[in-house]
Design a protein with these regions (language model features):
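Pre-Walker A (pre-P-loop) alpha-helix and adjacent loop at the N terminus of AAA/AAA+ ATPase modules
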Residues: 1-45, 88-96
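Short glycine-rich substrate-engagement loop in P-loop NTPases that contacts/grips substrate
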Residues: 18-21, 68-102, 113
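Walker A/P-loop
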Residues: 28-72, 124
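Loop/turn-to-beta-strand initiation segments
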Residues: 38, 95-103, 116-118, 126-133
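A short helix-loop-helix "switch/interaction" segment in the helical subdomain of ASCE P-loop NTPases
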Residues: 43-49, 184-205
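Conserved AAA+ ATPase "SRH/arginine-finger" region at the nucleotide-binding site
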Residues: 45, 74-77, 153-166
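Conserved AAA+ ATPase "sensor/coupling" helix adjacent to the nucleotide-binding pocket
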Residues: 89, 150-151, 155, 164-179, ...
Length: 224
């Protein structure tokens, strides 16, 4: 998929998300890992494709966790047994000089209630070389487990700015040498006005659908 080619791998790659500056600044806080581990939550309200998971990986690198010391946990298939194993694994140091390890719990809202309760216990006693980063498109996922939501340092992702996405897509089209039909406007495409239904300002979706949108727009122009 084309969006994989343009997945953000550094801070400057993110588009239309002011919260990235907040996360970047937080990575420089002097008290991080001072006596206990870190638990950060990258959340949005029903907004997918806005960079949360990519930001989790960039954050892990910024905090000194190597690729081999960063582990993704799929919350859809996560079980109590998996979390028990994780609790033991966390006490092993990473391969970097600081020994840090990052655990990214993707789409954390899919954890079952029993797993959420166990996660609460894990977060309360994280080893000081560990950061757990949760990503979620829900802001009420932890309502049934008292105290779980408040355990996180939270960063809210918003719906990306349409003009910024349009500029980003135009740059991508230029890099790929895509033909831009006369009359095609990137801002109209982002707004879903070019014959392709997009999922809000979902950057991933906008990138993946772009080549087909350009071809269809060109075909319609010829037919007219």
């Amino acid at each position: 998929m084309l969006s994989e080619k343009y997945r953000p791998t550094k801070w400057d790659d993110f588009v239309g998300q002011p919260v990235i500056e907040d996360i970047k600044a937080a990575c420089g806080d002097s008290w991080l890992f001072d006596g206990c581990g870190e638990r950060w939550l990258f959340e949005s309200e029903n907004i997918a494709g806005c960079g949360k998971t990519c930001a989790a990986y960039v954050t892990a690198r910024a905090l000194g966790c190597s690729e081999f010391a960063t582990e993704r946990i799929d919350s859809r298939s996560c079980t109590i047994a998996d979390l028990r194993e994780l609790a033991t694994s966390m006490h092993t140091y990473g391969c970097g000089g600081n020994g840090r390890r990052a655990f990214i719990i993707d789409e954390i809202q899919h954890l079952g209630q029993a797993c959420q309760r166990m996660l609460l216990g894990l977060l309360e006693s994280l080893p000081k070389h560990v950061i757990v980063i949760g990503t979620t498109t829900s802001t009420n996922w932890a309502d049934d487990v008292d105290g779980l939501y408040s355990r996180w340092r939270r960063f809210r992702f918003r719906k990306p700015n349409a003009p910024e996405i349009a500029d980003h897509l135009e740059r991508i089209a230029g890099e790929l040498g895509l033909t831009i039909p006369p009359g095609f406007r990137f801002i109209s495409y982002v707004q879903g006005k070019c014959g392709i239904e997009l999922k809000g300002n979902n950057i991933r979706d906008c990138i993946d659908q772009l080549p087909d949108a350009l071809r269809r727009y060109k075909g319609k122009a010829r037919a007219a």
